[in-house]
Amino acid sequence: MALNQQDVARIARLARIELTPEQQSRAQDELNGILHLIERLQAVDTQGVEPLAHPLSAHEDIPLRLRQDAVTETASAERRAELLANAPEQSAGLFLVPKVIE
């Protein structure tokens, strides 16, 4: 599969990215290179290959570094106030951002 200029223009429009003709041409080359690599990876026979939890786990005994999914306070009240001072808009200790999705 290869992308043409129209495909790249459509992807850029969907991503709300404005590209010059030069950037569009470069993006087309890069995306086609990525798609070619994916095709090569898909062509590899992986029947009988055990899945890995970590890419190095086949060579080393690496424990999985998982943590509990729990809410924690990561910054002190002073640090939070310092960080929020950089926000153009804030409310109730949260950053306010403009709507970006229609």
From Swiss-Prot:
Any single GO BP term: regulation of translational fidelity
GO MF: asparaginyl-tRNA synthase (glutamine-hydrolyzing) activity; ATP binding; glutaminyl-tRNA synthase (glutamine-hydrolyzing) activity
Catalyzed reactions per annotation: L-glutamyl-tRNA(Gln) + L-glutamine + ATP + H2O = L-glutaminyl-tRNA(Gln) + L-glutamate + ADP + phosphate + H(+); L-aspartyl-tRNA(Asn) + L-glutamine + ATP + H2O = L-asparaginyl-tRNA(Asn) + L-glutamate + ADP + phosphate + 2 H(+)
Record-linked InterPro entries: Asp/Glu-ADT_sf_sub_c (IPR036113), GatC (IPR003837)
Highest taxon, organism lineage: Bacteria
Function description: Allows the formation of correctly charged Asn-tRNA(Asn) or Gln-tRNA(Gln) through the transamidation of misacylated Asp-tRNA(Asn) or Glu-tRNA(Gln) in organisms which lack either or both of asparaginyl-tRNA or glutaminyl-tRNA synthetases. The reaction takes place in the presence of glutamine and ATP through an activated phospho-Asp-tRNA(Asn) or phospho-Glu-tRNA(Gln).
EC number: 6.3.5.-
Membership in a protein family: Belongs to the GatC family.
Residues spanning the signal sequence: none
Pfam families: GatC (PF02686)
Keyword Protein biosynthesis (UniProt): yes
Name of the protein this chain belongs to: Aspartyl/glutamyl-tRNA(Asn/Gln) amidotransferase subunit C
Membrane-crossing residue ranges in chain numbering: none
Swiss-Prot/TrEMBL keywords: ATP-binding, Ligase, Nucleotide-binding, Protein biosynthesis
Lineage: Bacteria, Pseudomonadati, Pseudomonadota, Betaproteobacteria, Burkholderiales
Subunit structure: Heterotrimer of A, B and C subunits.
